[in-house]
């Protein structure tokens, strides 16, 4: 049996009852539910997401493999009325597989640990209640340690243009001046060469295409706090930075 961390979310009404139904279904399907957090009201991330969310976390013991468990979570979403019409849109129930023991996996459709979990306040606020000791193998930190890094007043985030974006005329002058969004300051990381900056995170922006996931880890993952964002244009990049700031600060 493998200890797994699951995130629950929803914002179309009745989320509390759907969370309970999902937990009961997972327990009945052969996974053993060890702990469930309180429900937290959180801000929606992105204009398409709709109104505020209810979020929670659960710890399971599962005899299934990671792909089997992912398919089981998606089946429970469907039973609870989830319709996948709009990516990042409003939803009745969202079940995300965050951690599968200390497994690391990088495949189309399943990346473990979840690439964006470590900077999302709406994920960690509930996860720390039930899984503070669970380990993020890529960052080499516990959930409790990741949560503590969100409990600061200001966040400096370095932004790098990667691949063709670095040479793109569309992105000429992009983020020449730091972008302040609430408590989060986004700065081009190249501007800080030779300057010691205690980055909360680094974002690597790459050109999006239809094959891309929304986020990923860099190929050569150095163990630092780096996230790849796939963007379509400077305007889309700025929107994703604003969404990232909302995810960090809640």
Question: What is each model feature region?
Answer:
Residues 2-6, 12-87, 92, 101-104, ...:
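Nucleotide and nucleotide-moiety/phosphate-recognizing core
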Residues 45-52, 70, 74-78, 82-163, ...:
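Flexible, gly/pro- and Lys/Arg-enriched active-site loops
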Residues 9-10, 163:
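Residue-level signal for short, function-critical loop segments
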Residues 157-178:
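Glycine-rich phosphate-binding P-loop
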């Amino acid at each position: 049996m493998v200890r797994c961390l699951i995130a629950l979310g929803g914002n179309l009404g009745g989320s509390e009852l759907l969370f309970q139904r999902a937990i009961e279904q997972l327990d009945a399907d052969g996974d053993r539910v060890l702990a469930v957090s309180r429900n937290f009201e959180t801000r929606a991330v992105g204009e398409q997401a709709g109104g505020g969310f209810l979020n929670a976390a659960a710890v399971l013991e599962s005899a299934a493999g990671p792909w089997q468990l992912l398919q089981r979570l998606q089946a429970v979403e469907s039973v609870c009325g989830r319709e996948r019409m709009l990516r990042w849109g409003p939803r009745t129930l969202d079940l995300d597989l965050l951690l599968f023991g200390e497994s690391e996996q990088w495949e189309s459709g399943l990346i473990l640990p979840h690439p964006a979990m470590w900077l999302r306040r709406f994920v960690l606020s509930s996860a720390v209640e039930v899984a503070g000791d669970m380990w993020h193998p890529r960052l080499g930190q516990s959930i409790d340690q990741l949560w503590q890094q969100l409990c600061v007043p200001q966040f400096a985030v370095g932004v790098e243009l990667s691949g063709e974006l670095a040479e793109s005329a569309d992105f000429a002058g992009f983020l020449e001046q730091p972008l302040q969004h609430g408590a989060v300051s986004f700065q081009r990381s190249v501007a800080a060469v030779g300057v010691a900056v205690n980055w909360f995170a680094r974002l690597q922006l790459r050109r999006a295409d239809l094959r891309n996931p929304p986020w990923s880890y860099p190929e050569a993952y150095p163990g630092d706090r780096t996230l790849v964002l796939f963007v379509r244009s400077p305007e889309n990049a700025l929107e994703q930075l604003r969404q990232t700031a909302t995810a960090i600060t809640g």
